[in-house]
Amino acid sequence: MKGICILGSTGSIGVSTLDVLARHPDRYRVVALSANGNVDRLFEQCRAHRPRYAAVIRAEAAACLRERLMAAGLGGIEVLAGPEALEQIASLPEVDSVMAAIVGAAGLLPTLAAARAGKDVLLANKEALVMSGPLFMAEVARSGARLLPIDSEHNAVFQCMPAAYRAGSRAVGVRRILLTASGGPFLHTPLAELETVTPEQAVAHPNWVMGRKISVDSATMMNKGLEVIEACLLFNAKPDDVQVVVHRQSVIHSMVDYVDGTVLAQMGTPDMRIPIAHALAWPDRFESGAESLDLFAVRQLNFERPDLARFPCLRLAYEAVGAGGTAPAILNAANETAVAAFLDRRLAFTGIPRVIEHCMARVAPNAADAIESVLQADAETRKVAQKYIDDLRV
């Protein structure tokens, strides 16, 4: 039986992971859970799964959880507090696998800690890899950690790739990687109407159930841009070899086009429990709880090229991965700051790419050869982005 730590257990991916794990109590034991501050949900998860540790970033929330666990007779669960607690539980000796499901840059250090400790890293936090790039991959190679992608697109590519893909996509006969995108809720919205889009409209994804931040990223297609960067790193591919294809039905989750004309596609219902179960069981398979795909109900599949005028964030992501170094970290920090402002109604939806473009022009990228360089670029960009947003409101 394997021990698992779930970073971000109260979020969408964390909840889905626990749903899958509950179906296979003979395969995994939950060693540690973590949350930012959702004490109510974390308490219920602790009561259901009885982890040894529960880590909470906010100290006051940790104190509240500790009191509730004691009152419920669950005082044996050790409650840890602070960002460093996440790194601690991610590298515990009794943990074999780490589900890295914290959204945004906050997940970087604990995910990196899991990689350094040689764990099986089930990577749902794309920002950690986008920010640290080759530095993260070097730690994976050094420690012998196994990196298993959870994003539906990268998990699909992983399933369609030959085992030797780390030698380089071209070296194993891959012509290109085709990442599918739903196009989000505004694929056909008149451009003039995007200026007045509300947070409620932006988070209403047509196919997937996701958190608020990633739903906005899907609406701007920054989510797909981050996935392009992630695909280059995971599969040792060049940016020109990763193509985005708008596929409205979200039935094909991605494809791999080989030099002999073969195209392999991974298909399934849009349910994150499928890639989660694949990574948890790999190299085996087990039941996920998701419905099987009914091809007769699907009936047709449509594909189109993304409109970069409608989705400038996708263009900016390609520019960042082409620039290299800390440019992807700058892109990510600017996007996170802009999305937070949009969700807080302090920035228009169309202001998100403007903030990112401003930051990429103002913050010079450096070599991403140390974690300190990455964190410095992240911090500097957030300041530049926030000032730009504040100036827009004056």
From Swiss-Prot:
UniProt GO BP: isopentenyl diphosphate biosynthetic process, methylerythritol 4-phosphate pathway involved in terpenoid biosynthetic process
Record: residues binding 1-deoxy-D-xylulose 5-phosphate: 126, 152-153, 182, 205, 218, 223-224, 227
Catalyses which reaction(s): 2-C-methyl-D-erythritol 4-phosphate + NADP(+) = 1-deoxy-D-xylulose 5-phosphate + NADPH + H(+)
Binding site for Mn(2+): 151, 153, 227
Pathway note: Isoprenoid biosynthesis; isopentenyl diphosphate biosynthesis via DXP pathway; isopentenyl diphosphate from 1-deoxy-D-xylulose 5-phosphate: step 1/6
Gene Ontology molecular function, alphabetical: 1-deoxy-D-xylulose-5-phosphate reductoisomerase activity; manganese ion binding; NADPH binding
Keyword terms: Isoprene biosynthesis, Manganese, Metal-binding, NADP, Oxidoreductase
Parts forming coiled coils: none
Stored InterPro entries: DXP_reductoisomerase (IPR003821), DXP_reductoisomerase_C (IPR013644), DXP_reductoisomerase_N (IPR013512), DXPR_C (IPR026877), DXPR_C_sf (IPR036169), NAD(P)-bd_dom_sf (IPR036291)
Cofactor list: Mg(2+); Mn(2+)
EC number, as in UniProt: 1.1.1.267
Residue numbers binding NADPH: 10-13, 38, 125, 127, 211
Keyword check for Transport: no
Sequence similarity: Belongs to the DXR family.
Protein task: Catalyzes the NADPH-dependent rearrangement and reduction of 1-deoxy-D-xylulose-5-phosphate (DXP) to 2-C-methyl-D-erythritol 4-phosphate (MEP).
Name assigned to this protein: 1-deoxy-D-xylulose 5-phosphate reductoisomerase
Origin species: Methylococcus capsulatus (strain ATCC 33009 / NCIMB 11132 / Bath)
